[in-house]
């Protein structure tokens, strides 16, 4: 019998229904230790806070080996990037922008008012964040799609001031990659910074108003969103509180719930495509079919080596963060998937919609064989900035809501306040905060005068 070449580790959970604690111990999970790089990143953030753009440029030259002539990319450079871009890429970007905008425009919540009789209303309104910094990475790959996924929901929320920051590229004159600039142009973003890494995050958070040229004044933002490497994530942790952040994103991940009828070639390619991002990327198959597990492993082993990024893919698939989980049945597969809480979850089963309805924890759910994760990465219309490392148990992906602040507007007239005053005073006394009660009483003590 021909020996099967195995790429992915197999975890056999058959024979019992695992508990949540057991699953958190045994499921493949990689992740990164952000604490390990804080001693490197903290001095960078502090120096940029103190010295501004000069420090950011120094660190960019040290880490990226390139120093742009200015941090703010000139408008003519942005214009030229779009003019020079392949028309097919331009059309693809436009189509993705249109679909993402269509989805995110529908997410806008409506203002609503609750009334407690005449003269007592609580109105919840939604106010957009004023200024947002959007980070577009430029490491193993270039991500104009991330520009779209961050900019569009911010625009739909009504954010008035947007800046995109992306690493300068030595091969492109010290400016960010042209596709990043072109995407910004298509989206109507006019402020782009040639800055990456932890220094970009710090500069977005603290800004710099010391420049002689007013065009180079770099105003701080109120929120920073967008993916990045471990150093970017560590910097976001350090500036959190000074600004808001979307999340501390870890390495990307996919989990696939599949049964015996699933196509092993499709699953293999979906696992490979996610592993292509990063050597720390996680690719996990959860199945009740031992035969499917074996066939997927064979297909992965046969096909990964012909990809352009084969070494990266191989390391990711062989890592502790990737694997195949065998279970007794689909209900158990759902339990496992919920415990794993994948960034991306694909469902390849009979009645896949019914299975998807049972899922509680996932950044995004891709239902059926014709809804692969790469579709969501680019052009489905959904957002690809999603919670990682199990955080989908309590958080969700980037959306229009991310950039909106729900604010309660309270209005009570004299009659309405009088009606509830005894309740307020009683609670104030119960908490031993008598001045709270006096603030109510004083409004009615001389009411007849």
UniProtKB/Swiss-Prot annotation:
GO cellular component terms attached to this protein's record: cytosol
Cofactors named for this entry: Zn(2+)
Keywords: Amino-acid biosynthesis, Histidine biosynthesis, Metal-binding, NAD, Oxidoreductase, Zinc
Bound cofactor: record note: Binds 1 zinc ion per subunit.
Amino acids binding NAD(+): 135, 199, 229
Any one of the GO BP annotations: L-histidine biosynthetic process
Disulphides: none
Binding site for Zn(2+): 274, 277, 377, 436
NAD is among the record's keywords: yes
Cited NCBIfam families: hisD
Descriptive protein name: Histidinol dehydrogenase
Organism per entry: Corynebacterium diphtheriae (strain ATCC 700971 / NCTC 13129 / Biotype gravis)
Designated gene of the protein: hisD
């Amino acid at each position: 019998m021909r020996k099967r070449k195995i790429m992915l580790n197999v975890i056999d959970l058959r024979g019992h229904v695992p508990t949540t604690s057991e699953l958190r111990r045994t499921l493949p999970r990689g992740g990164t230790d952000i604490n390990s790089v804080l001693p490197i990143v903290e001095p960078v953030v502090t120096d940029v806070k103190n010295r501004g753009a000069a420090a950011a440029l120094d660190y960019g030259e040290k880490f990226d080996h390139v120093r742009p002539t200015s941090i703010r990319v000139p408008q003519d450079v942005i214009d030229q990037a779009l003019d020079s871009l392949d028309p097919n890429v331009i059309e693809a970007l436009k189509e993705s922008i249109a679909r993402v905008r269509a989805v995110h425009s529908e997410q806008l919540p409506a203002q609503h008012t609750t009334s407690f009789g005449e003269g007592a209303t609580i109105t919840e309104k939604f106010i957009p964040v004023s200024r947002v910094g959007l980070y577009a990475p430029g490491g193993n790959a270039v991500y104009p799609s991330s520009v779209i996924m961050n900019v569009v929901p911010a625009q739909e929320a009504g954010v008035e001031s947007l800046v995109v920051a992306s690493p300068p590229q030595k091969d492109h004159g010290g400016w960010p990659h042209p596709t990043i600039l072109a995407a910004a142009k298509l989206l109507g973003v006019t402020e782009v910074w040639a800055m990456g890494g932890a220094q970009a995050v710090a500069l977005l958070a603290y800004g710099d108003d010391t420049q002689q040229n007013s065009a180079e004044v770099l105003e701080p933002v109120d929120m920073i969103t967008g993916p990045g490497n471990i150093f970017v994530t560590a910097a976001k942790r350090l500036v959190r509180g000074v600004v808001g952040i979307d999340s501390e994103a870890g390495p990307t991940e996919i989990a696939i719930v599949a049964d015996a009828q699933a196509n092993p070639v499709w699953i293999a390619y979906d696992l490979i495509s996610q592993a292509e991002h990063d050597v720390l990327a996680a690719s996990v198959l959860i199945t009740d079919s031992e035969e499917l597990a074996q066939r997927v492993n064979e297909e992965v082993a046969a096909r990964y080596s012909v990809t352009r990024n084969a070494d990266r893919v191989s390391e990711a698939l062989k890592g502790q963060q990737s694997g195949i989980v065998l279970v007794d049945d689909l209900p158990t597969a759902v339990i496992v998937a919920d415990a794993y809480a994948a960034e991306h979850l694909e469902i390849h089963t009979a009645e896949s919609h019914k299975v998807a309805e049972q899922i509680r924890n996932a950044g995004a759910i891709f239902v059926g064989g014709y809804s692969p994760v790469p579709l969501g990465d680019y052009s489905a219309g959904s957002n690809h900035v999603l919670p990682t490392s199990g955080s989908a148990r309590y958080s969700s992906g980037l959306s229009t809501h991310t950039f909106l602040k729900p604010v309660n507007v309270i209005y009570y007239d004299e009659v309405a306040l009088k009606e509830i005053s005894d309740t307020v005073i009683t609670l104030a006394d119960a908490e031993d905060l008598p001045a709270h009660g006096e603030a109510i009483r004083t409004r009615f003590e001389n009411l007849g005068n």
